[in-house]
Amino acid sequence: MSKRDYYETLEVSQDASEKEIKKAYKKLAMKYHPDRTQGDKSKEETFKEVKEAYEILNDDQKRAAYDQYGHAAFEQGGHGGGGGGHGGGFGQDFGDIFGDIFGGGGGGGRGRQRQQRGSDLRYNVELSLEDAVKGKSLEIKVPTYVSCEPCDGSGAKKGTSAKTCSTCHGHGQVQMRQGLFAVQQTCPTCSGKGKVIADKCTSCRGQGRVEKTKTLSVKIPAGVDTGDRIRLSGEGEAGEHGAPAGDLYVQVNVRDHDIFVRDENHLYCEVPISFVTASLGGEIEVPTLGGKVKLKVPKETQTGKMFRLRGKGVKSVRSTSTGDLMCKVVIETPVNLSGDQADLLRQLEEKMASSSKKHSPKETGFFDGVKKFFDDLKS
């Protein structure tokens, strides 16, 4: 009875990553482990098949050999198929991808070429802070390669199909004898693809894909920030000859905002207040992304004081909690004063000068420190 394909056994694709293979093995090993199957012989056999498949596909050299020669790579007396040389055994020890370097020069077995998936693509999108925080649906146009419809991605003319390469027997490589050594080379007939198309599709010229600008709908989740990526699986370039498509990554960049600066979940802004409000206290309006809110400013507030508005920040895409809005008050100096207004300020200054320590403790403390500094220099 012929063995099952190792990739099929582990339920993964031929271009599966090492991580995907390990994950699949753990899942199946747990499912079919003898301790869990209560003596079921068929499941015990499946467990052995899974273990054998993992031992091969988890080893880079053994996997490469399997991809090249199939199960024949690990069978005693297994033969490579055509490709130059005199034919001989390749089944002794396949720890080395080249097999027994002094063995026969027949290349190949029943392996097959792994399809080369299409390239991944990146699309840059720029968002306002409001759109990044609330989320948005976009339509984007992406120049790419898509599968050719007339030939369904095969590259062959409708009604025909690609044939297995007679030179390399579908392996994509041949072995050439150079003295005592057998050297692997890309098959010159099929250029390493393992198949040959006699009647090429006229739409894609045998490539199985054509250039096209795709229109895609993208849902930007709420809370994204600059540097975040959204993956659209299978929306990258289509691979040649029906190979899987790559992925499309939408790269987010958030424009600078006129009022707010974002730091993770928190927002920061500066709010100007008048000299009178800072001195006597009062209520001011503060902008948030959801509209204006009232903020009470206590009397004798100094410039630079920070007020926290809880829950008025951002709910990040990576977090369930909402950040805060940090408002820094900046006291504005009056400008364009009339003569009467200037006189009033001078009168105020004169009245406060007699008790400056009481009204301007920081200023008084500063000048006292300066005086002490120069007194110390003189002594």
UniProtKB/Swiss-Prot annotation:
State the compartments where it is located.
Cytoplasm
- The residue spans of each CXXCXGXG motif repeat are 148-155, 165-172, 187-194, 201-208
Q: Which residues bind Zn(2+) 2?
A: C165, C168, C187, C190
Among CDD domains, the record links this protein to: DnaJ, DnaJ_C, DnaJ_zf
A Gene Ontology molecular function term for this protein is: heat shock protein binding
Instruction: Extract the InterPro entries matched here.
Output: DnaJ, DnaJ_C, DnaJ_domain, DnaJ_domain_CS, HSP40/DnaJ_pept-bd, HSP_DnaJ_Cys-rich_dom, HSP_DnaJ_Cys-rich_dom_sf, J_dom_sf
Q: Which GO terms describe its cellular component?
A: cytoplasm
SUPFAM superfamilies, A to Z: Chaperone J-domain, DnaJ/Hsp40 cysteine-rich domain, HSP40/DnaJ peptide-binding domain
GO biological process annotations for this chain's record?
A: chaperone cofactor-dependent protein refolding; DNA replication; protein refolding; response to heat
Q: Which UniProt keywords apply?
A: Chaperone, Cytoplasm, DNA replication, Metal-binding, Repeat, Stress response, Zinc, Zinc-finger
**How many and how are cofactors bound here?**
Binds 2 Zn(2+) ions per monomer.
Residues where Zn(2+) 1 binds: C148, C151, C201, C204
Residue intervals of the J domain: 5-70
Zn finger (CR-type) ranges are 135-213
Just give the chief location class: cytoplasm
The protein's required cofactor(s) are namely: Zn(2+)
Q: Which Pfam families match?
A: DnaJ, DnaJ_C, DnaJ_CXXCXGXG
Q: What is recorded about the protein's domains?
A: The J domain is necessary and sufficient to stimulate DnaK ATPase activity. Zinc center 1 plays an important role in the autonomous, DnaK-independent chaperone activity of DnaJ. Zinc center 2 is essential for interaction with DnaK and for DnaJ activity.
* Subunit comment: Homodimer.
**Could you tell me what this protein does?**
Participates actively in the response to hyperosmotic and heat shock by preventing the aggregation of stress-denatured proteins and by disaggregating proteins, also in an autonomous, DnaK-independent fashion. Unfolded proteins bind initially to DnaJ; upon interaction with the DnaJ-bound protein, DnaK hydrolyzes its bound ATP, resulting in the formation of a stable complex. GrpE releases ADP from DnaK; ATP binding to DnaK triggers the release of the substrate protein, thus completing the reaction cycle.
Q: Which family does it belong to?
A: Belongs to the DnaJ family.
**UniProt name for this protein:** Chaperone protein DnaJ
Q: Which organism is it from?
A: Colwellia maris
